[in-house]
Amino acid sequence: MAKNVVVVGTQWGDEGKGKIVDWLTDHARGVVRFQGGHNAGHTLVIGQKEYKLNLVPSGIVREGVACYIGNGVVLDAHHLLSEIRVLEAGGIKVRERLRISPGCPLILGYHAALDRAREAAKAACDKIGTTGKGIGPTYEDKVARRALRVYDLFDRERFAAKLKANLEYHNFVLTQHLGAEPVGFDEVFDEAMADAAEILPMVADVSAELYAVNKAGGSLLFEGAQGTLLDIDHGTYPFVTSSNCVAGQAAAGSGVGPGRLHYVLGITKAYCTRVGGGPFPTELDIETPGTPGQQMSTKGREFGTVTGRKRRCGWLDLAALKRSIIINGVTGLCITKLDVLDGLAELKLCTGYMLDGKRIDLLPMGSEEVTRCEPIYETLSGWSGTTFGAQSWDALPQEARAYLHRIEEICEIPIDVISTGPERDETILRRHPFGA
């Protein structure tokens, strides 16, 4: 019987979703991206090869698995083709297995120009930490009903007319409000038409194809990008991304009914990280040698896949995790990077906050309130042994098992999967999402 699983990040992104999606793909007929754009990065380690992906679903490295880019994704066609060529150079067949929704809004040159100019104009304290890739301005165009979509690539005249109108609007903002250079019509149009020749053969009715896969008994894996705490509605607004990163978006962003989402796997690191601006209650010093934060940063190789920026690091925040569990309807958790904590004498779990003199047990919604939150910690013993590469629960040190049990107790949700390294087999399975 077909079963559909949604994988979402429960933190601020970078939770290790790519490896888990790849690991789960053995049981899926297809993998679906349903939100975000090429601002999200995921890294897969397969044998001696490392693949850094932004737009192509992680299932592409599994032979015979179909991959879908749903209507909720904003698409930089030029970047997608560059990514495809890198994969093809590595011997991976992509074009015959990748299907793109005609409803995807297109990221064009003026979107990136707007993104960069706006961020440059902000005061340092107001900077979001955008990747500057045009994601936000493209979603703005979508909501304003002026976006050019993949569908428009089929008609040169329609595309040209819409592009001309959009450039008149956006170039006014760029030149008159932001003091930036205008973006030329020919440059954007010519690149889009050149890309269209390669993109259009991969365009398909994604919603109908996903329905057909399920009807034939095939299971699907929905791959979330970024993380719940970056969600445009539920995250630490305004220090968020421009899309919905939560499990419910899997339905809207791909064209499947919510009743066909059967299991939600929430991915969380054994600690917390964040890239860019915004409040982070459990943040630690990552620069001082010998400190827990510095170990998380260096041992965890905490640098952004897309930007290369150092990630901020801190203790695992269970008040934030519980908020994510509620929002996503998480069925089970997957803990990643447990091995990064190996060797620390003691560990701390944030179980709640003091906010304006009162204790609260869930992350508040406004970033101003989150900034005022002071974490309440519970201290646990660390472990001297290694968890790296462990493949069974019993192979973990007793203190590591106690740490995981405490997370389950406080969050009232089972930990079904534990990742102990980047390779596929460095995984502990307690309950399989496709079998649960």
From Swiss-Prot:
Keywords: Cytoplasm, GTP-binding, Ligase, Magnesium, Metal-binding, Nucleotide-binding, Purine biosynthesis. GTP binds at residues 13-19, 41-43, 311, 337-339, 419-421. It comes from the Bacteria. Substrate binds at residues 305-311. IMP binds at residues 14-17, 39-42, 131, 145, 226, 241, 309. One of its GO terms (biological process) is IMP metabolic process. Pathway: Purine metabolism; AMP biosynthesis via de novo pathway; AMP from IMP: step 1/2. It is found in: Cytoplasm. The active site is at 14 (proton acceptor), 42 (proton donor). Mg(2+) binds at residues 14, 41. Its EC number is 6.3.4.4. PROSITE patterns: ADENYLOSUCCIN_SYN_1, ADENYLOSUCCIN_SYN_2. One of its GO terms (molecular function) is adenylosuccinate synthase activity. It catalyses: IMP + L-aspartate + GTP = N(6)-(1,2-dicarboxyethyl)-AMP + GDP + phosphate + 2 H(+). Binds 1 Mg(2+) ion per subunit. Belongs to the adenylosuccinate synthetase family. Plays an important role in the de novo pathway of purine nucleotide biosynthesis. Catalyzes the first committed step in the biosynthesis of AMP from IMP. Homodimer. This is Adenylosuccinate synthetase. It comes from Azoarcus sp. (strain BH72).
